[in-house]
């Protein structure tokens, strides 16, 4: 954290008796996580996406039924948000269950059938991006690398994490040489060594209250776009969530 007063020291009217406020910031590589959007491919559930998430659920000891429900609900939400142009208006549902809304953030996956406990376990390992993305082997955890790579043992995933700390991968062939897995184990549809999507977090803390702003940004070459931004108080003066 940095004191806000350090940025305002040139202000002759600054009052030293004022309470200290602190600024902090963080950038997270979201392509170091499994992307929930990969569960859908066009107008169907993705076989490779389900395989990766199934391995992650198994590693974390989570019920596979929740994954099945989440994928089905995500497909339903996607179809409702982007109905085929040749089918006309969406027809009313006959099962009495309203269409789920299309989530924008990981916290909103509760809408699709995840329990709070499962969401808490998954949150460090997953993201929700507007398009399908490969996993960046330079920033993903061993759990994510193991999940996204068919046939890769957890020990080999941990070996990759250790190797990149000494020398980041510049190509997928670098990872293949270390893992010594089967040919084609690392491919551009599932893996990468660079990223386009990041979350930028900024916080302002005063006493026990923290105001946090989170933004999803997309970088393409020298062009950076903000796709969404959310701001809110994450703790009150009693140290509890608002």
Predicted regions located by residue number:
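Compositionally biased linear targeting/interaction segments
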Residues: 1-242
């Amino acid at each position: 954290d940095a004191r806000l007063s350090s940025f305002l020291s040139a202000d002759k009217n600054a009052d030293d008796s004022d309470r200290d406020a602190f600024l902090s910031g963080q950038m997270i590589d979201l392509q170091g996580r499994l992307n929930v959007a990969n569960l859908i491919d066009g107008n169907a559930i993705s076989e490779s996406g389900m395989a990766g998430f199934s391995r992650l659920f198994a590693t974390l000891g989570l019920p596979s039924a929740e994954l099945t429900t989440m994928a089905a609900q995500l497909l339903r939400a996607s179809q409702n948000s982007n109905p085929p142009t040749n089918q006309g208006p969406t027809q009313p549902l006959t099962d009495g269950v309203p269409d789920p809304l299309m989530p924008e953030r990981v916290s909103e996956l509760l809408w699709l059938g995840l329990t709070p406990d499962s969401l808490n376990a998954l949150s460090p390992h997953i993201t929700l991006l507007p398009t399908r993305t490969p996993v960046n082997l330079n920033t993903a955890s061993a759990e994510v690398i193991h999940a996204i790579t068919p046939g890769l043992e957890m020990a080999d995933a941990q070996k990759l994490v250790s190797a990149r700390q000494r020398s980041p991968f510049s190509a997928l062939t670098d990872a293949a040489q270390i893992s010594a897995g089967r040919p084609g184990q690392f491919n551009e549809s599932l893996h990468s060594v660079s990223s386009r999507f990041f979350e930028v977090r900024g916080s302002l803390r005063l006493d026990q209250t923290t105001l946090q702003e989170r933004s999803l940004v997309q970088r393409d070459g020298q062009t950076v776009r903000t796709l969404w931004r959310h701001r809110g108080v994450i703790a009150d003066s009693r140290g509890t969530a608002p």
